[in-house]
């Protein structure tokens, strides 16, 4: 089965880009299915269901959505196998440190050109380890700003393929669909691995500690000066 994982910051247009891409995939005779990962709430599944495709929603709630998606990856693929031939996973995009792509999936980063020229330097592995970077909202900034933004993306990920896409009209989504169609299948799910390590977990805050004093905290901790240490038994 082909698996494409779509990551990006909130409001970048991930769902809109995927909807236009799915229409192209359907027109080409494919049977895409979608898993939508979010934190506390989503109604994006309603938009997907209007396309007449199977949709599964996963809410991570108190768990990091990146860890949640990774932990449930095998279950998502198993769910999709008898429903379609392409699995599209839309992640929550909660933090800039997300690293959701696996080695044999197609990693798609959706990033908003209006978020500022330094954003590509801030977002980490979901851009730097992506196969494809989709730049949205480029039509509402100047040509000079678009060129600077594009160069910053290439600075952080020189091997990626960049597409400028309009989430409203769908312009550019045919090319995204073609990339998905031409991507490789995941054949050995048991040995599939992440491209980049996930954000750090577990610390005392992760398991419910609310006191802020440093003396109450255990686990893998990073100090303000950048030093990382382990506190505990």
Curated annotation (Swiss-Prot):
It comes from the Archaea. One of its GO terms (biological process) is protein maturation. GO terms for molecular function: GTPase activity; nickel cation binding; zinc ion binding. Coiled coil: none annotated. InterPro entries: CobW/HypB/UreG_nucleotide-bd, Hyd_mat_HypB, P-loop_NTPase. Pfam families: cobW (PF02492). This is Uncharacterized protein MJ0120. It comes from Methanocaldococcus jannaschii (strain ATCC 43067 / DSM 2661 / JAL-1 / JCM 10045 / NBRC 100440).
């Amino acid at each position: 089965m082909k698996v494409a994982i779509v990551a990006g910051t909130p409001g970048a247009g991930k769902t809109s880009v995927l909807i236009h891409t799915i229409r192209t995939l359907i027109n080409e005779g494919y049977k895409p299915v979608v898993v939508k990962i979010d934190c506390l709430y989503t109604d994006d599944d309603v938009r997907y269901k209007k396309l007449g495709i199977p949709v599964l929603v996963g809410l991570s709630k108190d768990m990091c959505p990146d860890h949640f998606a990774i932990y449930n990856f095998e279950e998502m693929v198993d769910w999709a196998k008898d429903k379609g031939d392409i699995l599209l996973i839309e992640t929550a995009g909660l933090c800039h440190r997300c690293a959701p792509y696996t080695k044999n999936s197609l990693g798609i980063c959706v990033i908003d050109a209006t978020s500022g020229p330094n954003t590509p330097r801030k977002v980490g592995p979901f851009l730097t380890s992506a196969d494809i970077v989709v730049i949205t909202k480029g039509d509402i900034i100047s040509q000079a700003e678009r060129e600077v933004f594009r160069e910053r993306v290439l600075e952080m990920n020189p091997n990626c393929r960049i597409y400028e896409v309009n989430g409203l009209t769908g312009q550019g989504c045919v090319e995204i669909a073609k990339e998905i169609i031409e991507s490789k299948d995941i054949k050995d799910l048991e040995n599939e691995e992440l491209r980049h390590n996930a954000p750090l977990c577990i610390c005392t805050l992760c398991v419910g500690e609310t006191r802020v004093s440093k003396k109450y905290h255990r686990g893998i901790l990073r100090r303000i000066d950048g030093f990382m240490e382990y506190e505990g038994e």
